[in-house]
Amino acid sequence: MKQTDGAKKQLELLLQRYPILAGQRDEIDGAYQIIAASYEAGGKLLIAGNGGSAADAEHIVGELMKGFKKTRRLDEALAERLLRESPELGPDLVQHLQKALPAIAMDGHPALTTAYANDCAPLMCFAQQVNGYGRAGDVLLVISTSGKSKNILYAAVTARALGMKVVGLTGGADSPLLPLLVDQEVYPENLAQLGRNEARSEERRVGKECRS
């Protein structure tokens, strides 16, 4: 997929703000290409992370499921159908609804996750959701600083078995996630070995989400 001018501009701005990521230009662009291609084909994005990474997952979903830098207007065809369906309520829906990029953060759904954790296997809650939500052509985005979280690894294996692509935000060349990824963004430091850099990993990730 050809990168749009807008995407190119955002990538350049990101690298200007965070020069340390310059060595990961191809990985960042590759992740964009994979996710964008899935959306164009009617796919969706599932996101998994623990702790601060779970907060990142929720943040990403919040930006994808509504307008972010631009308001995403509804397709005219849908707007017309809404107006036909309800002349009374349709105008409000047309005014306020926005096009969404389907995304699900799997750290939520407490009834499902606690039931599955209690009845089955706590570390496979993400994998169970991938099994239920995922379809071939969808993308799983996994966020793990160390890449060693078992619940993340279980989810990645399940996604691959379903024919999904797996993109990871992880750290360090020894991250166990790497063999499971079609593309990855590996920070310059080996974050799995240098625990002091975990905060820097989180800082860069949050910075990219908030400012790009």
Regions found by a protein language model. Give the residues of each.
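Generic N-terminal amphipathic, Lys/Arg-enriched alpha-helix
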Residues: 1-23
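A short, well-structured juxtamembrane/interface segment
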Residues: 23-41
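Short beta->alpha connector loops at strand-helix junctions that form conserved
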Residues: 127, 144, 170, 183-195
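Surface-exposed amphipathic alpha-helices with a cationic face
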Residues: 156-160
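Short, glycine/polar-rich helix-capping loops at beta-to-alpha or helix-loop-helix junctions
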Residues: 168-181
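Conserved small/polar residues in nucleotide/adenosyl-binding loops
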Residues: 203-210
